[in-house]
Swiss-Prot record:
Gene name of this polypeptide: groEL
Keyword flag Transmembrane: no
Protein family according to the UniProt entry: Belongs to the chaperonin (HSP60) family.
Catalytic activity: ATP + H2O + a folded polypeptide = ADP + phosphate + an unfolded polypeptide
Sequence positions that bind ATP: 29-32, 86-90, 413, 479-481, 495
UniProt EC number: 5.6.1.7
The species this protein was found in: Fervidobacterium nodosum (strain ATCC 35602 / DSM 5306 / Rt17-B1)
HAMAP family listed in its UniProt record: CH60
Domain of life per record: Bacteria
InterPro entries: Chaperonin_Cpn60_CS, Cpn60/GroEL, Cpn60/GroEL/TCP-1, GroEL-like_apical_dom_sf, GROEL-like_equatorial_sf, TCP-1-like_intermed_sf
The protein's name in its UniProt record: Chaperonin GroEL
Length: 538
């Protein structure tokens, strides 16, 4: 396949055209008065959105050289979205501002490598300042504010705050379609897994077809139970206490199942048998989770624990165990809190190391089940188009809120980046030559987001910036929705620090790469030959 090449200044101008195409489409959505973009779909109804990353992802340019620039900006948006769940538009606006000014300097003869060095030094200084400005979330109201801003809806903000309050920092919150037009939160307390009773004869509530036991013992094993003899000693010990027994095993069959059912029907021993969740290594890990949560042990051949030797101390305990046809819920496990914390920390470390998205999800789910529970936000809407858009907003807001809990919050509306510029003044005095130009690029770009927010709301950015900087208060800024100057924290206009930091770092990274680009190589499009020769004219 033949290639086309473009060099130096011409190459950079092509990249700039691609950057502008994406950035100009995305930046009109910034702020509370950002506009919408309608995106055509190859099938189904068009999508209406004001989410930066969704718009950027849809853009492909016909000019292959310009398209390279467009793809680089898309990378900024999606990278920021992956890390923080929000801030994609801010990242795009920052990247465009840095690239535009940087290209002017390179065209005037500045050294791109030194400019990049200056950009990197300035960025790390501003990131430190963002960390200093940030403050931890102190209340559910703060969480609701962050979520409301990201989702552009107070109702969604309250739902996310409610869900996060219930499941805690490490809990899992999932987003699913509702069967009605209402949007609400469902909460599952305790450890829940998708395995139910092995036989319906265990049912204690025939109306609901479920088994409910208060303060049961829990026997956990990774074996198949078919021979009843090794189980008799522990069954007798439990029967003497008069408390119920829940057995979680790889499988329960033959005489063991018959014995358990008969004892249940006679009232000698209230019991239920449940298959262990998961498969292979995941099953072993989940059984260990259940054991730690309930304060028991896993009776496994691998560690040489025989069923005959089990004592009541080896069994897990819980406040309530509820077993349905295909799910089991353990509420109020009696495991030691410090052991549970250790296990959660261990799973957290695994999440950080894994690269597989699926593995990450399953580990987060396991951590949530140990840490407190699972909340499901059921999303309802009148039409399919509205449902898709609403679901997307909730998922974004959820990521942004998690980021806020993780690294704290900063004043929103582009104020933090604008005020963080002051740390660059000593840097600009220290640096010389082209490195100084790089730092100057970052300094100037930091006002781009607030300028764009003001512009989208119909105000003059220069006047807004002047008035905001007239006061030294870090939280003093401009509410573009109401057109008023105010304390951003009090007004609830806040951003997660992680979002602001990621937006700046990703924008600076792409700007540096683009400015140091000298050659573009693309594939030469093939000329399509007609399927058949043209008919001769007579």
């Amino acid at each position: 396949m033949a290639k086309l090449l473009r060099y130096s200044e011409e190459a950079r101008r092509s990249l700039e055209a691609g950057v502008d195409a994406v950035a100009n489409a995305v930046k009109i959505t910034l702020g509370p008065k950002g506009r919408n973009v309608v995106i055509e779909k190859s099938w189904g109804s068009p999508t209406i959105t004001n989410d930066g990353v969704s718009i950027a992802k849809e853009i492909e340019l016909e000019d292959k050289f310009a398209n390279l620039g467009a793809q680089l900006v898309k990378e900024v948006a999606s990278k920021t979205n992956d890390v923080a769940g929000d801030g994609t538009t801010t990242a795009t606006v920052l990247a465009q501002a840095m690239i535009k000014e940087g290209l002017k300097m390179v065209a005037a003869g500045a050294n791109p490598i030194l400019i990049k060095k200056g950009i990197d030094k300035a960025t790390s200084k501003v990131v430190e300042e963002i960390k200093k400005i940030s403050k931890k979330l102190s209340s559910t109201e703060d969480i609701a504010h962050v979520a409301s801003i990201s989702a552009n809806s107070e109702e969604i903000g309250k739902l996310i705050a409610e869900a996060m309050e219930k499941v805690g920092e490490d809990g899992v919150i999932t987003v699913e379609d509702s069967k009605t037009i209402d949007t609400y939160v469902e909460f599952t307390e305790g450890m829940q897994f998708d395995r139910g009773y092995i036989s319906p004869y265990f049912v204690t509530d025939p109306e609901k077809m479920e088994v409910v036991y208060n303060e049961p013992f829990i026997l956990i094993t990774d074996r198949k139970l078919s021979n009843v003899k090794p189980l008799i000693p522990i069954l007798e010990k439990v029967a003497q206490t008069g408390r119920p027994l829940v057995i979680i095993a790889e499988d329960v069959e033959g005489e063991v199942l018959t014995t358990l059912v008969l004892n249940k029907l006679k009232g000698t021993l209230n019991t239920v048998a449940v298959k262990a969740p998961g498969f292979g290594d995941r099953r072993k890990a989940m059984l260990q989770d259940i054991a730690i949560l309930t304060g028991g042990i896993v009776a496994s051949e691998e560690v040489g624990i025989n069923l005959e030797d089990l004592t009541l101390q080896d069994l897990g305990r819980a406040d309530v165990v509820r077993v349905k046809k295909d799910e089991t819920i353990i509420v109020g496990g009696k495991g030691k809190p410090e052991e549970i914390k250790k296990r959660v920390a261990q799973i957290k470390a695994q999440i950080e190391q894994t690269t597989s998205e699926y593995e990450k999800e399953t580990l987060q789910e396991r951590m949530a089940k140990l840490a407190g529970g699972v909340a499901v936000i059921k999303v309802g809407a009148a039409t399919e188009t509205e449902l898709k858009e609403k679901k997307h907003r909730i998922e974004d807001a959820l990521s942004a809120t998690r980021a806020a809990v993780e690294e704290g919050i900063v004043p929103g509306g582009g104020i933090t980046l604008l005020r963080a510029r002051k740390v660059l003044e000593p840097v600009l005095n220290e640096l010389t030559g082209d490195e100084k130009l790089g730092a100057q690029i970052v300094y100037n770009a930091l006002e781009a987001p607030i300028r764009q927010i003001a512009l989208n709301a119909g105000y003059d950015g220069a006047i807004i910036i002047h008035n905001v900087l007239s006061k030294d208060d870090v939280a003093y800024g401009f509410d573009a929705l109401k057109g008023e100057y105010c304390n951003m924290y009090e007004r609830g206009i806040i951003d997660p620090a992680k979002v602001t930091r990621s937006a700046l770092q990703n924008a600076a990274s792409i700007a540096g790469m683009l400015l140091t680009t000298e050659v573009l190589v693309v594939e030469k499009p093939e000329e399509k030959k007609p399927a058949a020769p043209e008919m001769p004219e007579y």
